[in-house]
Amino acid sequence: MVPGYHRPAAVKVNLGAIRRNLENEMKHLDPGQKMLAVVKANAYGHGAVEVAKVAEEVGAAGFCVAVLDEGLQLRHADIVKPILVLGVVSPKYAPIAAVNNISLTVPNFEWLKEAEKYLAKENLQLKIHLGIDSGMGRIGFNEDDEFIEANKFLENNDQFFVEGMFAHFASADSADESYFEHQLEKFNHMKSLLTVKPKWIHVSNTAASIFHKNIKSDLVRFGIGIYGLNPSSNPASADLNPDIKLEPALSFESELTHVKTIHKGDGVSYGSTFVADKDTIIGTVPVGYADGWIRKFQGFKVKVGDKYCPIVGRICMDQFMVELPEKMPVGTKVVIISNNPDDPNNIKAAADYVNTIHYEVACLLNDRLPRIYYEK
């Protein structure tokens, strides 16, 4: 989408908070342990290039993305540190990754054989990380025989440099550690089958790095914590490691573009799901579901000036309406999502309201909303 620079609505990102979150995690790394900053999905909606530059300054060893194009975006922005694509990239694009020094995930043996053909044609070597499905049920090796066969294939194979081996935990943030332990056991078993020697072995995501300090991993893949958000939906989990302070970086702001009084019996928005029972002051905000502010947020309270006001009527594609307690001037500031975790319209509260997780709310805020960066 085209960013709406001439519309009073934007996502604001405090790079100072991002910096402090990264620094706090760096302090908790084990001696010799390194950090990969996860900046996939436009850095969870915060802006991949800007976040990556801060992470480079702080000392991140490299970056994780989800698709090859995200890695290429970083390279085009002169990011030179290692980049790992966590998702599956078609083998035919392996040469593009190799030329741009981007590491790819190997999901299975068949992928290796196909990628080798494309790399051999151009006499290229690709850096790879062996993905292990230890219980996520997503991508990666999960059978011993196939993994052993892949290892033999990689021995003395000039088309590949085995840079890493990794898995992803499904429940590192859960109070019940049984499945976490099952996954760790499975990963360690697969690691014992290695005949090639990766530079990096990594299993720790944000949740594992915060809640499971006993995990031995060359790298920590630090993701949601960069943005100051708790990796767990369990509020008590924030106390599992009180030394790590997470400071939310994102706020979502707009302003009133229209204010009017409607009368008893008047409806608001499509379907007239809100009908005034008395004279009511309505304010219009130029943000809608086309920006990622979905219709389920009807009823959620946003901050208009210094008052919390409910969204009334259905959220439109490009606008939504709020019920105001008093006449307010056009141009009054509207904080849709606050970066203050104590405010009732913080991102966790927004996620709870629509029965999802804050990861999704942040990622929903799309490119039509300009990102404004500041350091505080």
From Swiss-Prot:
A Gene Ontology biological process term: peptidoglycan biosynthetic process
Residues that bind substrate: 138, 317
Entry annotation: catalytic residues: 40 (proton acceptor), 270 (proton acceptor)
Domain of life, per lineage: Bacteria
GO MF entries: alanine racemase activity; pyridoxal phosphate binding
N6-(pyridoxal phosphate)lysine modifications at: 40
A GO term from the CC aspect: cytosol
Reaction(s) this enzyme catalyzes, per UniProt: L-alanine = D-alanine
UniProt keyword terms in alphabetical order: Isomerase, Pyridoxal phosphate
A Pfam family annotated for this UniProt entry: Ala_racemase_C
UniProt similarity note: Belongs to the alanine racemase family.
HAMAP family linked to this entry: Ala_racemase
Protein name from the UniProt record: Alanine racemase
